[in-house]
């Protein structure tokens, strides 16, 4: 049983990205210009390799992960989906608190702690977002967010087997973010942790289902569309130091 759960978690990483919370038609138009931080919108020196891995991952997603997301969509109503989304967000909150602490942002650290305590108690284990109604909105910080805070650029775009799309800065997030820096992992049973992680990834895949389906059906180059969209969404979610400029990649 544990092996099946672990396999589900790995497969759910192919397309699941919480950064893509909405779909905008403009997001599909790849533009290799420079963003407000001075970074190349996408630096992809390993595109030939990445495209091969992308094709491999896409097959696995179509055969296994996408059907799971569709099944989740069909068997649950909006109320259940909202509860799952709230629960998943609450589980991530201690990690956000830790990363804000590493960024020396003590105000947001304490707000994240209070958000977790309120939702875990009054929100019945995080099923209801009580804290959001009293001025403590949901925020998500990963170790990659912390590295960006201290001036680490995204680096080369990468598509890794099974893991999926990432970049040099964020590629360790799946291990460091989900395990090493999340306090809950040290106080809960392994089976519970794996179950929560599996539910989280399936929920993430469901969230991006409209986006991925649209791209696969309408884009002339799904690789470029997904690369551009994921990079833009991720860069929009991090905060670099004031006056920070990403280094120009070497030719």
Curated annotation (Swiss-Prot):
GO terms for biological process: intermembrane phospholipid transfer. Transmembrane segments: none annotated. The keyword Signal applies. GO terms for cellular component: membrane. InterPro entries: MlaA. Keywords: Signal. Residues 1-18 form the signal peptide. It comes from the Bacteria. The keyword Signal applies. It holds the Pfam family MlaA. Belongs to the MlaA family. PANTHER family: INTERMEMBRANE PHOSPHOLIPID TRANSPORT SYSTEM LIPOPROTEIN MLAA (PTHR30035:SF3), LIPOPROTEIN VACJ-RELATED (PTHR30035). This is Uncharacterized protein RF_0076. It comes from Rickettsia felis (strain ATCC VR-1525 / URRWXCal2) (Rickettsia azadi).
């Amino acid at each position: 049983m544990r092996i099946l759960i672990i396999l589900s978690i790995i497969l759910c990483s192919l397309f699941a990205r919480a950064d893509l919370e909405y779909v905008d038609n403009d997001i599909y138009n790849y533009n290799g210009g420079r963003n407000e931080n001075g970074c190349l919108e996408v630096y992809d020196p390993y595109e030939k390799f990445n495209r091969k891995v992308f094709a491999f991952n896409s097959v696995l997603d179509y055969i296994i992960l996408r059907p799971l997301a569709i099944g989740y969509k069909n068997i649950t109503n909006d109320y259940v989906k909202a509860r799952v989304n709230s629960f998943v967000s609450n589980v991530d909150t201690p990690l956000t608190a830790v990363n804000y602490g590493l960024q020396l942002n003590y105000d947001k650290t304490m707000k994240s702690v209070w958000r977790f305590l309120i939702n875990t108690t009054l929100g019945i284990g995080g099923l209801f977002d009580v804290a959001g109604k009293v001025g403590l909105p949901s925020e998500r910080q990963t170790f990659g967010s912390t590295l960006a805070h201290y001036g680490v650029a995204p680096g080369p775009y990468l598509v890794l087997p099974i893991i999926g799309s990432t970049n040099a800065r964020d590629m360790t997030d799946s291990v460091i973010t989900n395990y090493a820096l999340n306090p809950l992992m040290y106080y809960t049973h392994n089976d519970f942790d794996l179950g929560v992680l599996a539910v989280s990834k399936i929920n993430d895949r469901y969230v991006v289902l409209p986006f991925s389906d649209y791209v696969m059906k309408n884009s002339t180059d799904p690789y470029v569309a997904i690369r551009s969209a994921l990079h833009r969404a991720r860069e929009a979610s991090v905060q670099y130091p004031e006056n920070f400029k990403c280094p120009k990649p070497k030719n």
